[in-house]
């Protein structure tokens, strides 16, 4: 009979150490669970042969008392926009349906070197352009908290890293990689009731992450607990010669005390007034207020702060996003890279038809909009101005962090909406709502973490977001760990 797997990485590692569980049997259970939960559509593909081969090696290391790390033998998942050697990497798009990389993304490679076991590649919005994981060529992903097999209307998982969030929430994986351009890790983490973390830009290598918006893309981490998130972060952070945007200084792993020993006395918590916005649900507002009160009762001081350019941020983000998308998508021409049409009348027609077949409407619209903003007559009016306002948004954060140590905000404006409701609005309008609270952190390059707090009246997760100054990850994790211990979120783990 299968032994129920533990909830946390530390517990799993201890089971391996005492040999009450071994990596092979744990992996077999995980693969069985993934098979039972196929209706969630969290995975584009699983890799059972690779996973079991990795588990055999991990089992040998544990038996000899030489595990590589806390992650040795832990099942993980990787979003399908990170390159994995010998395994299809599709970005959930027809354009890359048959793409098999010859190398690994740095962040996955570092996890593998720490002994983590790859269960499979997770579903996403095409190229990461979405906030629901609803437009993949492999079909939408269903939120684990409210999914009934065969039911056509379900709660969305959030996006674009929805598959990774569901893989973690359902217990298939202990951790998963996502990407975060405007909230694509934190948004699904919020809806699925898991921890979602976006680090300071440059602390995690983007090598092998198929680019969407180079100036904002960062790898993200999804786990069930703050400690697990920190363990993964410690394993993959640090400079990478293959990515010139990584910080060149040595990364010192972060350690935290037990939650009971964390003291918040003297901590200054900022509450941005602009985040009390249109569409914010009463339940999220109440949760936000209660956690602020909880922090104050623990000795922290809570202060209203202003981030004046918040209202402009979503529009500036949209312009810059589309401009960089137009540039990045130019490489997919059907000649050297990506889907190739059967058209052979001319090179121009081959190029046009390959792109028409390989991209969905969302991608095409962003390419067209981006190229419009980049036209010579529009460049100064849109792109240059957007860059200037982005600097003002970053300055907002700089000023706020001169007054406070950390910011507390909603992650999403409500609990997870139904699929039928979500698709009533087009992708652009949905992103304007779904990314409102999350994309400013990408614009400023600062670290941010989404933490599940409680369940709504619909028995769905409600989460809040913490943001900290650049390179203040330790402070972020410390406060998150303290809150986690106080709220004791009710998990729905298998």
From Swiss-Prot:
It catalyses: L-glutamyl-tRNA(Gln) + L-glutamine + ATP + H2O = L-glutaminyl-tRNA(Gln) + L-glutamate + ADP + phosphate + H(+). It comes from the Eukaryota. The active site is at 79 (charge relay system), 160 (charge relay system), 184 (acyl-ester intermediate). It comes from Aedes aegypti (Yellowfever mosquito). The lineage of its organism: Eukaryota, Metazoa, Ecdysozoa, Arthropoda, Hexapoda. It is an enzyme of class 6 (ligase). This is Glutamyl-tRNA(Gln) amidotransferase subunit A, mitochondrial. Subunit of the heterotrimeric GatCAB amidotransferase (AdT) complex, composed of A, B and C subunits. GO terms for molecular function: ATP binding; glutaminyl-tRNA synthase (glutamine-hydrolyzing) activity. It is found in: Mitochondrion. Allows the formation of correctly charged Gln-tRNA(Gln) through the transamidation of misacylated Glu-tRNA(Gln) in the mitochondria. The reaction takes place in the presence of glutamine and ATP through an activated gamma-phospho-Glu-tRNA(Gln). One of its GO terms (biological process) is mitochondrial translation. Gene3D superfamilies: Amidase signature (AS) domain. One of its GO terms (cellular component) is glutamyl-tRNA(Gln) amidotransferase complex. Belongs to the amidase family. GatA subfamily.
